[in-house]
Amino acid sequence: MVVDKIQAIRGMNDVLPDSTSIWRFIEQTFINCLVRYGYKEIRFPIVENTQLFKRTIGEITDIVEKEMYTFNDLNGDSITLRPEGTAGCVRACIEHGLLHNQQQKLWYLGPMFRHERPQKGRYRQFNQFGVEALGITGTGIELELISICRRLWIDLGFSQSVQLQVNSLGEINERQKYRSILVEYLRDHFQILDEDSKRRLDKNPLRVLDSKNPDLQQLIQNAPKLIDVLGDDSREHFQSFCNGLETLGIPYSINPVLVRGLDYYGQTVFEWVTDQLGSQATICAGGRYDMLVEFLGGAPTPAVGFALGLERIFLLMETLNLLNESNNKQSIFIIATNEEAILKALVMAESIRNAHPSLDVITNTAGGGFKSQFKKADKSGARLALILGEDEIAKEYVSIKDLRTEIEQISIPMTKINEFLQDYLA
């Protein structure tokens, strides 16, 4: 009987064992960095009430109109797979009283879902790392988030391959004033607009500036600039932010047409971009969203955050040949030829793990000949092969082969293995 194979849904990819160690390295680098800055993890469901995203992201956005995975559950309630993390994080903070006279510095990591056209760097299920700081005013917290990003890029090895772009969206009344100016400009060029931009023109014209249509980029670049209509307070806030970047020694450029694809942003917005990934140039984006908590029924609360996609980080590191460097943890492969040797190998492996917690120890419990086991050892990427054959078991010795050099194989007493590893791998 021929049975059709069931495959993964288009745009939702498996991460296979050859790549998971690199993913884990990237994830752990993020986690370690945020812990060092005093941020705490929060977890929230991947499924939320659909109204959460319609209210926060904005109904006239590509995400809500075209990209959300929305369906009715068995009770007839409309629910949605989360397309981004900020709304769910804020909802959880309000629901559990985390913002009552408190400041919160939070991070999260997990899958998001958007029904986009799959392409390199853009998938229907993607993994996002997010950071949110709530209850803190001023530019200091914005600068801290930028510093966190820069630290992440340094730790991952590509700080010279990304550039920071910044802009200010001002206060809501300033955006409304700018909206009228922008609409007038766009109406003068109505015949050039694509259908999406024409539809956005009356309901959410700032989204036109977020268009990725190459035919509209010249029109967008020539559009009136929001920064030119900012009031004194917004100008002072943005100037303070830029001055802080200069004090911290963080290079940046002002991108006057930078807007965020989500409606809840205001004041400072930023993106980290690279010229290494073609059209998928943005690897991290964020900004201030002081009105979002109030939109969701909470008390007015200042807030700022950013998010980045792990798939694009992986692609960037792959493009820059950084993946091998990220996966260089020392490891040992123990070769055992029979049942007695396998038992000895298990005992030895536990002893090594106790004495050297940072070492990965791989034990081959499947047995087999030396040739096949050495192939497995090479494929594992291990630095050393520890060999327990019949001769070694009889003499209570272990043979050691460095798999990355031409150093001659040696044998030492089993009781000396931890002492040897301490010196050899130092």
From Swiss-Prot:
Quaternary data: Homodimer.
GO biological process, one term: histidyl-tRNA aminoacylation
GO cellular component, one term: cytoplasm
Annotated protein name in UniProt: Histidine--tRNA ligase
GO molecular function: ATP binding; histidine-tRNA ligase activity
Record keywords, A-Z: Aminoacyl-tRNA synthetase, ATP-binding, Cytoplasm, Ligase, Nucleotide-binding, Protein biosynthesis
Cross-referenced NCBIfam families: hisS
Reactions it catalyzes: tRNA(His) + L-histidine + ATP = L-histidyl-tRNA(His) + AMP + diphosphate + H(+)
Organism: Legionella pneumophila subsp. pneumophila (strain Philadelphia 1 / ATCC 33152 / DSM 7513)
Annotated CDD domains: HisRS-like_core (cd00773), HisRS_anticodon (cd00859)
Name of the coding gene: hisS
